[in-house]
Amino acid sequence: MLRRLEEFAGRDLYVTGCMPLVQMDEIRSVCNPRVIHPDEIQERSGSIGTRGPGATGVVQVASGCAGRCSYCITRLARGRLRSAPAEAVLDAVRGLLASGAYEIQVTGQDVAAWGLDRGESFPDLLRGISGIPGRFAVRVGMMHPASVTGILDDLVEAFHSEKVFRFLHLPVQSGSDTVLERMQRGYTAADVIRIVDAFREEFPDMMISSDFITGFPGETDEEFQETLELLRRCEFVKVNVTRYSRRPGTPAAALKDLPERLRKERSRALLAEANRIYDRYNERWMGRVTPVVATEKNVPGSTVCRNPCYLNVVIRDDLPPGFSGRALITGNHRHYVIGELV
C-alpha cells in the first residue's frame, strides 16, 4: 500500500481506513495526503447505511474488535468493539429498502460480536432485521469463529429466515491448533468443524467462505498440512489466501519471518486446493433450477444475480435491479455460474 501511495505522491490524495491510524509516519514519508478518520465518514454521512452498486445496501453494525490476534493491526487502529444501537441498525436498513435496495450487507470487523458491549446478541439483531416488512435478503458479513461459538445454536436458528442468505464468512486463518494458539485466535480446528457442521446440517447447500494466512512465523510443514486438511474437511468456498506479512506494533512482528519463497509455495498450494473445492461446489448446481434476484449490472447484455445461497449467477440478459425469477444453471466459471431464465 505504501508503494501505491508513493506512485500517486504528486496528486491530491485522501487516505482513510485503519492504515493512517497506526502508520501515519510511514505514510508521511512517501506522500502528504489528507486524512479522513473512519469514524468521520459516518459522522459526515449521518448514517451507518450506504447504498452500494445496483440493488445493494451496506450497514456497518459495529466497529473495532473484541479479539486480540497477535498479528492484526485492526484492533490497534480501531480500538475495542463498539456496536451500533439496534434501532439505528434497523433504521438504516429501512432507509436502504426505501431507496430501492434488495441485498442488505451487514458488515463489521466481526459481525458475530455485535452487542457484546451492550449486553445484546447478534442473532436477536438478525431476527430484528429479517422481521422488517418488505422484499429483501440479508448477507451476513465476516464472523470470527471465537465469537460464533458462544451463540452458535441461536445463530443457526436465526439463519432459518428466508430473508437471510445461506452464506457464511468464517475467517479461519489456520487449521493448526498450535498456529492458532500463536495467532491468539481463541478457538481450535475442532471448534471450526463444529460450526461448519452445525450450519451444513441445517443448510446442506450453504456457501461457507473463509480466509487463511500462510507462512505465519514458525509454521512447520506439518502445521501447514493441518491447514490443508481443515480446508478439505470443511469444504470452504471462496477462500481468500494471504501470505503473512508483519504489521508494526503487533506481538507477531517480533517473531522471525519464514522465507518468502516458502510463504508463496504454501499460498499457491492452498489456493489450488481451494479452487478445486470451489469448482466442485459449483458443479453441484449444474442442471438445477434455482430462484435468483438481480443485484447489479455486469457488462452490457448480462446481469449479476444471487440465489438463496449467495451463488453468483450471471444471466446473459439486461435485467433491472431487484428482478426475481428462476434460472437453470448451465455453466461453471468458478467465480460465477451461468444461468438461463426459465
Would you name each region that the model predicts?
Residues 1-38:
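Cofactor-cradling patches in redox/metallo enzymes
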Residues 14-16, 22, 98-221:
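Conserved SAM/AdoMet-binding glycine-rich loop
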Residues 33-59:
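N-terminal [4Fe-4S]-dependent radical SAM core
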Residues 54-87:
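Canonical Radical SAM [4Fe-4S] cluster-binding loop centered on the CxxxCxxC motif
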Residues 76-105:
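Conserved alpha-helical substructure of the radical SAM core
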Residues 89, 106, 140, 170, ...:
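Conserved, mostly hydrophobic/aromatic
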Residues 222-267:
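C-terminal, non-catalytic macromolecule-binding modules
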Residues 246, 254-342:
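Terminal RNA-binding accessory module
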